[in-house]
């Protein structure tokens, strides 16, 4: 590769905002690599990182509180453009000689800011024009404090009636502050604001493209593993599928995938995985049929957490057994992605993103004799999907709805039995097929059937029957943190219900789950 796609990079210092990952994603959508680091990076680390631009995120603290976080001095000494967002603007103002105070009017939600003066950041950007011909922007606010006096060298960029200084700039130094959140989709011109900042003001080249990312990842994998053999646990999910396709292109037959069929997969999923990777792409895949083992270990277990642990531990047991049969494997590949890395790394101050244990970071058995290769660890999920398409994976596979690690094990309430799994597989397949036929599959974020271990009376012809209940679940969400139930058309639900009851002998009733998250979770267990 002639150009280093990481050389053009934007550093995002995180002050604890819930939107920080969105900032990184927006910058990358513009075509420039960005990374999130905790706000307490040292001056030396920042200079060594050598960013083309720096963004200071929002955060929950108050600049007016004594011990609240500040940006490292190097941020303002490096000579690169700086954009402060919300808290980031406030700490920039305070550190450079301005004043911040708590506001009597807190602004949360939609607002309209009036653009003041000329600035490279807002050039030719507007949503509306006011009666005086001034440019107005529709934005998203979320703040209690506000800047009441700008540093002497700054000019006013934007204002609202309750926040007279909603944006400020020191054009000569290329320092900018905005009180609103351009990273949130409710700020309609957010992408253009970031384009101006990153491409025009900072002069970054848009090298961060799917084709370049694939080429760079292949180079790095080859350099790292050399002629060694690599092992990958292939689940059929998006992340592991993209890793398989990427590694196969990079190192060919040095890769062996182990696909553990636990008997808790969707209808024909195991065969589809084998057809796609082994048959069509020529990837070496070992299929371990472990349905009987998983079901025997789950016998009599009702507690969801216990089921998850048993399924996870049994997977490792089967994977280890298959791995032991392979000779001279040195590397274990994993589908770790960037949000996993962020969640598992927190600054010593605890102001960065919350630490939580994640299945792909640090959850490996202590005695595993492999070194790790994680080719997706810099990428967000939407980027993983894009490079999946770049690698030639089918759209329907890359944009398939999320499926839980324990599979149908957490969609069968209570004890897992083969009879229940078989019924659920059929019901789920009918639901998904009809969603696709009605062009509703990609309008929902996640849709699936749930097996309820309760019996209900039904009538077929003249005969009374007493059979199981299936619940359908479909939700719409942006981030999976909150979700609303999908308002599917009644005729579609009627068709799905009729098919399930008529085509599956063990089901007498179909219900539709109309619970939103919160308070309900998306999965039932």
Curated annotation (Swiss-Prot):
Enzyme superclass (EC): ligase
Gene3D superfamilies, alphabetized: 3.30.300.10, 3.40.50.880, HUPs
GO molecular function, one term: GMP synthase activity
Superkingdom of source: Bacteria
Keywords for this protein: ATP-binding, Glutamine amidotransferase, GMP biosynthesis, Ligase, Nucleotide-binding, Purine biosynthesis
Catalytic site: 86, 181, 183
This protein's record includes keyword Lyase: no
Reaction equation(s) it catalyzes: XMP + L-glutamine + ATP + H2O = GMP + L-glutamate + AMP + diphosphate + 2 H(+)
The keyword Ligase is assigned to this record: yes
InterPro entries referenced in this protein's UniProt entry, alphabetically: Class_I_gatase-like, GATASE, GMP_synth_C, GMP_synth_GATase, GMP_synthase, GMPS_ATP_PPase_dom, NAD/GMP_synthase, Rossmann-like_a/b/a_fold
Positions of the GMPS ATP-PPase domain: 208-400
Any Pfam family: GMP_synt_C
Chain positions recorded as ATP binding sites: 235-241
EC number: 6.3.5.2
GO CC terms of this entry: cytosol
Pathway: Purine metabolism; GMP biosynthesis; GMP from XMP (L-Gln route): step 1/1
Domain Glutamine amidotransferase type-1: start-end pairs: 9-207
Quaternary assembly: Homodimer.
NCBIfam families linked: guaA_Cterm (TIGR00884), guaA_Nterm (TIGR00888), PRK00074.1 (NF000848)
Function: Catalyzes the synthesis of GMP from XMP.
Listed name of the protein: GMP synthase [glutamine-hydrolyzing]
Gene field: guaA
């Amino acid at each position: 590769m002639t150009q280093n796609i990481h050389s053009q990079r934007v550093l995002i210092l995180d002050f604890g905002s819930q939107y920080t990952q969105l900032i990184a994603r927006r910058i990358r959508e513009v075509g420039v690599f960005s990374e999130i680091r905790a706000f307490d990076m040292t001056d030396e680390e920042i200079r060594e990182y050598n960013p083309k631009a720096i963004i200071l995120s929002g955060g929950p603290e108050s600049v007016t509180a004594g011990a609240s976080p500040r940006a490292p001095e190097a941020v303002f000494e490096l000579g690169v453009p700086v954009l402060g967002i919300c808290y980031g603007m406030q700490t920039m103002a305070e550190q450079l000689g301005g004043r911040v105070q708590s506001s009597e009017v807190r602004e949360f939600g939609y607002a309209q800011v009036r653009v003041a003066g000329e600035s490279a950041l807002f050039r030719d950007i507007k949503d509306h024009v006011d009666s005086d011909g001034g440019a107005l922007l529709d934005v998203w606010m979320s703040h209690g404090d506000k800047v009441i006096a700008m540093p002497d060298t700054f000019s006013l960029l934007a204002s609202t009636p309750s926040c007279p200084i909603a944006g400020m700039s020191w054009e000569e130094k290329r320092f900018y502050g905005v009180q609103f959140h351009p990273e949130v989709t409710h700020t309609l011109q957010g992408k253009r604001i970031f384009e101006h900042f990153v491409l025009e003001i900072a002069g970054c080249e848009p090298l961060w493209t799917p084709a370049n990312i694939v080429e760079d990842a292949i180079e790095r994998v080859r350099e790292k593993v050399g002629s060694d053999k690599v092992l990958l646990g292939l689940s059929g999910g998006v992340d592991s599928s993209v890793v398989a396709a990427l590694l196969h292109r990079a190192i060919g037959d040095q890769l062996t995938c182990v696909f553990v069929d636990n008997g808790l997969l969707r209808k024909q999923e195991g065969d589809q995985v084998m057809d796609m990777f082994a048959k069509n792409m020529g990837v070496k895949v070992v299929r371990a049929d472990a349905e009987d083992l998983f079901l025997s270990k789950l016998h009599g277990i009702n507690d969801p957490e216990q089921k998850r642990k048993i399924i996870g531990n049994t997977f490792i047991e089967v994977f280890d057994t298959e791995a032991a049969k392979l000779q001279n494997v040195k590397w274990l590949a994993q589908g770790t992605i960037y949000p996993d890395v962020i969640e598992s790394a927190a600054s010593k101050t605890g102001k960065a993103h919350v630490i939580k244990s994640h299945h792909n970071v640090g959850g490996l058995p202590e005695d595993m004799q492999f070194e790790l290769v994680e080719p997706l660890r810099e990428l967000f999920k939407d980027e993983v999907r894009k490079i999946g398409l770049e690698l030639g994976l089918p759209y329907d596979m890359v944009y398939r709805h999320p499926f839980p690690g324990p599979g149908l094990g957490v969609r069968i309430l209570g004890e897992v039995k083969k009879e229940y799994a078989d019924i659920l597989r059929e019901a789920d397949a009918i639901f998904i097929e009809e969603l696709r036929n009605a062009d509703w599959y990609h309008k929902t974020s996640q849709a699936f059937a749930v097996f309820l271990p309760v019996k209900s009376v039904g009538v077929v012809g003249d005969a009374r029957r007493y059979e199981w209940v299936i619940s359908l679940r479909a939700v719409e969400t942006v981030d999976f943190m909150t979700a609303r139930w999908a308002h599917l058309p009644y005729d579609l639900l009627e068709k799905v219900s009729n098919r399930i009851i008529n085509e599956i002998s063990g089901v007498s009733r179909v219900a539709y789950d109309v619970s939103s998250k919160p308070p309900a979770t998306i999965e039932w267990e």
